[in-house]
A protein has these predicted regions:
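Short alpha-helical scaffolding segments that buttress acidic/His motifs in well-ordered protein cores
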Residues: 103, 125, 200, 247-252, ...
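Phosphate- and other anionic-substrate recognition elements at nucleic-acid/protein interfaces
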Residues: 1-158, 256-257, 278
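Basic, amphipathic alpha-helical segments enriched in Lys/Arg and hydrophobic/aromatic residues
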Residues: 271-307
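A residue-level signal for conserved active-site and pocket-lining positions in enzyme catalytic cores
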Residues: 100, 134, 248, 273, ...
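Short helix-capping/linker segments at secondary-structure and domain boundaries
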Residues: 107-112, 141, 205-209, 255-262, ...
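Phosphate-backbone recognition surface of nucleic-acid-processing proteins
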Residues: 194, 199-272, 276, 302
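Helix-hairpin-helix/helix-loop-helix acidic hairpins
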Residues: 142-195, 204, 259
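Generic structural signal for well-ordered, non-transmembrane alpha-helical segments
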Residues: 132-135, 139, 161-168, 285
Length: 307
C-alpha cells in the first residue's frame, strides 16, 4: 500500500507520498489534476486522503474516482485533531499534506471510500448550495430593511423581490429533479418536504444502505456517551453532516405537528420529563430511522427485480 495525503487549496494541491521526501505542489486545475492522477495511478495500491476544503477538492475527488483510485475525504476537524494527537501544532500546507499521508497509512481501513455522485445528484447539490446562499441573503436583507431610510428602502425592496424570484426559480428546478428521482420513502411521512427530499438525495446517498445506528451517527443525531469512572455525563449529539441535520430538524418540526406517529412520540417523551429540545432530537432520530428503513426496503426490492 502507498499512502498519499493531499492538502487542497484554491490554487494548488500539495501532495505527500510514502517513500518520497518532501511535498510536491501541483496546480489545482484541470491540467494539474490530470497530471497528478496519472502519477497516482502508477502507484502500488494507492490510498489517498483529502481534507474537505469548501468544494475546492471536488474536481480532484471525481478525477480519482473516474480513474478507479481509492480516495477518502475527511472532515477538517478530524484532520486537525489527528494533527494535535501527533504533536504537530504548527500548520502549513506541507505539514497538512504530510499529516494526511500519515492518516492514510494508519487509518485507511477505517476511512470511508469516497463515491462520486451521479450527474443528477451533482446538479441537485449545486442547486441546494445556491438555494442556501439566496435564503441567507434574503434573511440579511429583511433585517436590514427595518433600518433603511425611505430612498434606500425602495432599492432594498427591489433586491428582495429579485431574490424571491430567484428562490422560486431554484425551487422549480429542484422540483423537476425530485419528480424524476425522489422515491416514495422520502415523502412517506408528513413534514418531509422538497428541501428534505433534495438534501437527502444530494447529500445523504448512504440512506438505506446503513443500519439505524450508523445513519444516526452519520447525520449527527446519535447520543454520545460522556462517562468516566463513576461519573455519567449527559448524552449529547455532536459531529455529523450539518446540512442534512438542519433539513431533518425542519422536517421534524413539521412532523411533530402533523404526523400522528411523530406527534404521539413527542408527547410521550415530554410526559416522561424530557426537555423540549431533547424530545425533538429524539424525534429527529426516529424520523430518520423510519425513512432509512423504508429506503432500505426500496433498495432490496430494486435488487430483487430481474435486470
Amino acid at each position: 500500500m502507498t499512502a498519499v495525503g493531499i492538502d487542497v487549496g484554491k490554487a494548488f494541491l500539495d501532495v505527500a507520498m510514502d517513500g518520497r521526501p518532501g511535498v510536491v505542489r501541483v496546480a489545482n486545475s484541470a491540467a494539474g489534476i490530470r497530471k497528478l492522477v496519472r502519477q497516482l495511478a502508477g502507484l502500488a495500491e494507492a490510498r489517498i486522503v483529502v481534507e474537505a476544503t469548501g468544494g475546492y477538492e471536488e474536481a480532484l475527488l471525481e478525477a480519482c474516482c473516474d480513474a478507479g483510485l481509492w480516495v477518502a475525504r475527511v472532515n477538517p476537524r478530524q484532520a486537525r485533531n489527528f494533527a494535535r494527537a501527533a504533536g504537530d501544532v504548527a500548520k502549513t500546507d506541507a505539514i497538512d499534506a504530510g499529516l494526511l499521508c500519515l492518516m492514510a497509512r494508519m487509518f485507511a481501513d477505517r476511512l470511508q471510500r469516497y463515491r462520486a455522485p451521479l450527474p443528477w445528484q451533482r446538479e441537485l447539490r449545486d442547486w441546494l448550495r445556491r438555494r442556501g446562499q439566496v435564503v441567507t441573503a434574503l434573511q440579511a436583507h429583511r433585517q436590514q430593511m427595518a433600518m433603511c431610510p425611505g430612498p434606500i428602502r425602495s432599492l432594498a425592496a427591489r433586491t428582495l423581490t429579485a431574490l424571491r424570484r430567484e428562490l422560486a426559480a431554484i425551487d422549480q428546478q429542484m422540483q423537476l429533479l425530485l419528480d424524476a428521482h425522489a422515491t416514495p420513502a422520502l415523502c412517506s411521512c408528513k413534514g418531509l418536504g422538497p428541501v428534505f427530499q433534495a438534501t437527502s438525495l444530494a447529500l445523504l446517498p448512504e440512506l438505506g444502505a446503513l443500519d439505524r445506528r450508523q445513519i444516526a451517527r452519520l447525520v449527527g443525531v446519535a447520543p454520545m456517551n460522556r462517562d468516566s469512572g463513576q461519573s455519567s455525563g449527559a448524552r449529547r449529539i455532536r459531529g455529523g453532516r450539518a446540512s442534512v441535520r438542519v433539513a431533518l430538524y425542519m422536517a421534524t418540526l413539521s412532523a411533530v405537528r402533523w404526523d400522528e406517529t411523530m406527534k404521539a412520540h413527542y408527547k410521550q417523551l415530554r410526559a416522561r420529563g424530557k426537555l423540549a429540545k431533547v424530545a425533538l432530537v429524539a424525534c429527529m432520530r426516529k424520523l430518520l430511522t423510519i425513512v432509512n428503513a423504508r429506503r432500505r426496503d426500496e433498495l432490496l426490492q430494486e435488487a430483487a427485480q430481474p435486470a
